[in-house]
Amino acid sequence: VKIIKIFVIVFLSIVILAGAFLGVMTFLEYRPEDVTELPIENNQDQILSLNTELSIMIYNIGYAGLGEDEDFVMDGGKQGIPSSQDVVEDYFEGIKSTLLDYPSDFYLLQEVDLKARRSYHIDQVLGITSALGDDYSTQFAYNFKSPFVPFPVSLTEYIGYVESGIATYATYRVESSTRYQLPGAFAWPLRVANLKRAIMVSILDIQDSDNDLYIINLHLSAYDASGTLREQEMAFLKEYLIELEELGHYVVVGGDFNQTFPEAEGLYPVQEGLWEAYAIEDSFLPSGYRFEIDTTTPSCRLLNQPYDPSSELTQYYIIDGYIVSNNITVLSYDGIRDAGAMTLDLGFGDADHHPVVMKFLLNEGD
């Protein structure tokens, strides 16, 4: 009887503690508005012009914690966080060097930590702002904010506190920057410590034009087994793109779609048991737009193991790229290759994604 009583007390204590934890997490859950106007730090004075060459880079930097020596538990690896602050700092220095090595008018970055246990509380938004210097404005939108992420279940590897999101840096004057919450969410209680996906829309005036340039930074859902989140996010994006096309604006969407582009289907067959990126439907792209991707180089690797290009278990994807409106001309990036986006093959040294760069101009009279 005494043993049963002890068991009951222990069991009830666990239930009460778990309930209290979920209650606190639910109370503290990040609940963003559907539309949030964002501050533009250090906004620039330079105004866009038609028929002027512009450059852009998209780069999921993986919070400087997913470089060549790392794996990740959600991808079939073992780690929840990098092993030390030195590891993160080394990757972060490499990431900043890459940004400086490929100067761009616009940088659209994903998985940038403002403050998080997994990146040892390094303010990466500020670090990149400082590295780029005074010629860039900074815009940041949350898509992951939680006081405690209890995953993976481990005394040392748990993710813990997270403030993270997407960041856009620009050398031209940005008239407004807005965070749009994407539809769909995981069910409670998974929802309380999970990502709240969004797009960040930067609007820029253009000299001698009644239309504007819309730069859209995004990072769409990945671990969505049913595909329902993806469907809702893509439907939202499509509707927004149709609206902008009808108004005649110039549009560049860039980021990590976490989906395989139609032109890239079948290039990297997914091995059995590994994460598979949904394919973007052929019918998704609205009239007046086209994809701009590089099919010659993978943009992402799976984190089921540290990077080993000779291993049969190394899985690649092409899930990072652009959507561009037809009133924009895309140029050759290096003057050698054909016109189009170009993925920078950096050997996944500092992140599990490669940067994708592009040069373009806004057509006059469109």
Which residue stretches match the model-derived regions?
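Active-site beta-strand/loop signature of hydrolases that rely on acidic residues for catalysis
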Residues: 55-61, 91-121, 169, 202-204, ...
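Surface-exposed cleft-lining segments at the edges of enzyme active sites
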Residues: 78-84, 112-115, 182-191, 219-228
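Conserved S-adenosyl-L-methionine
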Residues: 137-145, 177-183, 333-337
